[in-house]
């Protein structure tokens, strides 16, 4: 479960036994000698409004789709703005703009780089959208308005630049703003021997019970079989055999909240020559 009382001090992209575990703990810790994490969380939450919104005179910019309520003044008129939704599990938000009286104003909605088929309904009617420097700007008379935002963000395989030596010929799985990982809790040990074919469609399900509820991704892959290897012998003149595996991926930000085990973000890509 997600208690929130323990944390990671390093954002590593893999956790393997007897290597990184020797100097980086494989489980979340309650406290560190350098206590930067708790106050950083506090500062971020306290300043979150500055990240969600940007205001300039009679213009308000919505940068992040985080459920919240705020009060602003546009053209001298007080407005209450409310964002409701279940992002990033659902790619839709409802934005209510409630003014004391009607006035001229502009509201701008950021279009995330990963968003496809971005749509906005204003009071139930679809708006003609023109993107300007990453934002959809809607100007005119504002009073009591409801904006319904929706877009697609399918999970995809993302390769590493070949100049990144340790991740060359490897891929990560990303959905919208979330990076995913495989954990030993779902997929067994020796995750470094897993390979995936990036031509497949990534399946997505929502698990109400897992980690307080989150979107889980499912893919198929190959894993180097350990059958026939002589115990204690590191190298053998033999053919490598592969076996089929089904892999479950969870959001990277949630890793380490279950059993102590391996974790991997970058997986080897399976090439067919």
Task: Label each PLM-derived region with a short phrase.
Residues 1-9:
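Single conserved hydrophobic/aromatic residue that forms the stacking wall/gate
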Residues 10-90:
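Catalytic cores of secreted or luminal carbohydrate-active enzymes
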Residues 53-99, 108-110, 249, 256-273:
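Edge strands and adjacent loops of beta-rich recognition modules
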Residues 105-108, 138-156, 183:
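C-terminal beta-strand-rich structural cap/linker in extracellular carbohydrate-active enzymes
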Residues 151-229, 254:
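Glycine/proline-rich low-complexity spacer/linker segments in large multi-domain proteins
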Residues 204-273:
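Activation corresponds to long, low-complexity, non-globular regions
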């Amino acid at each position: 479960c997600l208690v929130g009382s323990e944390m990671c001090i390093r954002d590593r992209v893999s956790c393997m036994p007897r290597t990184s575990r020797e100097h980086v703990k494989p489980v979340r810790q309650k406290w560190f000698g350098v206590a930067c994490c708790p106050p950083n969380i506090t500062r971020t939450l306290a300043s979150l409004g500055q990240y969600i919104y940007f205001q300039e005179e009679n213009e308000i910019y919505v940068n992040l789709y985080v459920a919240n309520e705020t009060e602003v003044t546009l053209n001298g008129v007080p407005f209450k703005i409310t964002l409701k939704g279940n992002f990033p599990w659902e790619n839709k938000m409802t934005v209510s703009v409630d003014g004391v009286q009607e006035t001229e104003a502009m509201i701008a909605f950021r279009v995330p780089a990963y968003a496809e088929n971005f749509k906005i309904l204003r009071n139930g009617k679809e708006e003609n959208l023109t993107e300007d420097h990453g934002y959809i700007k809607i100007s005119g008379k504002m009073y009591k308005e409801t904006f319904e935002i929706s877009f697609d963000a399918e999970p995809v395989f993302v390769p590493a630049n070949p100049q990144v030596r340790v991740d060359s010929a490897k891929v990560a799985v990303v959905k919208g703003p979330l990076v995913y990982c495989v954990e030993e809790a779902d997929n067994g040990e020796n995750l470094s021997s897993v390979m995936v074919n990036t031509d497949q469609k990534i399946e997505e399900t929502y698990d109400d019970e897992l980690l307080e509820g989150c979107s889980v991704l499912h893919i198929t892959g190959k894993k180097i079989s350990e059958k026939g290897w002589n115990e204690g012998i590191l190298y053998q003149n033999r053919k490598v055999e592969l076996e089929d595996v089904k892999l479950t991926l969870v959001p990277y930000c949630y890793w380490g909240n279950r059993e102590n085990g391996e974790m991997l973000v970058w997986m080897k890509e399976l090439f067919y020559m």
